[in-house]
A protein has these predicted regions:
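An interfacial alpha-helical scaffold signature
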Residues: 1-251
Length: 251
């Protein structure tokens, strides 16, 4: 029987596993397609799974169900989320994957215990909008204008990187996260968008939210959005490569 995997958690967080070596149903929790969620014991860990039919379509609703299950488990314990679509072909494949990655999983559980992820979206005006294209009057100038355009593009990119780096440093100093993941890109409306994930102590969520409220009032030139707390999706190292039938890939 194939298993669909949602996340890894600590076995000690689920007293019902103390006397069982086989999968135990989780009460009042269903997964993709309404399937029963099981706690699958594996040494000191518990893998949260549901039975999986390979013919099932893992669609948008399935992705929402995956996130819901991970979120519900996060309320109870430390979790290492699996990537959406992670499937183990059978019991042996699941056990083999956990055994081979046991030390890595245990290390990540220890590092992320009591932690939560907060997500900031910061939007600012692009510091260097593209210049209007100048009409070329002679063929011999085309090459020079092309090289000039390349230099201007490279210069604008460096300026964007500098501005993005300055904003990320400012956010780091304001929120003082334990770890962070940042992406920066330009969007169609001429804005620079930073997606910032901060890892913080779960007990400090309210303080973080208060800091966000005051920061948004201070930084009038930034459009800021906050979401969370979330399971630590961005701070789980990808330990193995993806396969058609996955061998256990935390997201």
């Amino acid at each position: 029987m194939a298993w669909y995997a949602y996340c890894i958690s600590e076995k000690q967080a689920f007293p019902e596993l103390a006397r069982h070596r086989k999968p135990v149903p989780m009460q009042d929790l269903t997964g993709i397609s309404g399937n029963q969620i099981f706690l699958y014991p594996a040494s000191d860990l518990a893998v949260i799974v549901s039975e999986h039919n390979p013919a099932e379509d893992l669609n948008h609703q399935a992705a929402k169900d995956h996130a819901r299950v991970v979120g519900d488990c996060f309320k109870m314990s430390t979790v290492l989320p699996f990537r959406f679509g992670t499937v183990f072909a059978d019991d042996e494949a699941l056990r083999r994957s956990i055994r081979s990655n046991q030390r890595h999983y245990a290390t990540h559980v220890e590092r992320l215990r009591g932690k939560a992820e907060m997500h900031l979206r910061v939007m600012v005006d692009d510091c260097c909008l593209p210049q209007p294209v100048r009409a070329s009057g002679a063929k011999e100038t085309v090459g020079k204008e092309y090289l000039s355009s390349l230099r201007e593009t490279a210069s604008r990119q460096r300026e964007r990187q500098t501005k993005g780096r300055a904003i990320s440093v400012q956010m780091q100093r304001l929120f003082v996260p334990q770890d962070e993941e940042i992406t920066c890109r330009t969007i169609d409306n001429g804005k620079l968008l930073l997606d910032i994930s901060h890892l913080i102590d779960a007990k400090c969520v309210e303080r973080y939210q208060n800091k966000f409220a005051t920061t948004r009032e201070l930084l009038k030139d930034c459009q800021m959005q906050l979401s969370g707390p979330w399971p630590p999706y961005h701070f789980v190292q990808r330990l193995t490569r993806p396969h058609a039938t996955a061998a256990g890939i935390p997201a």
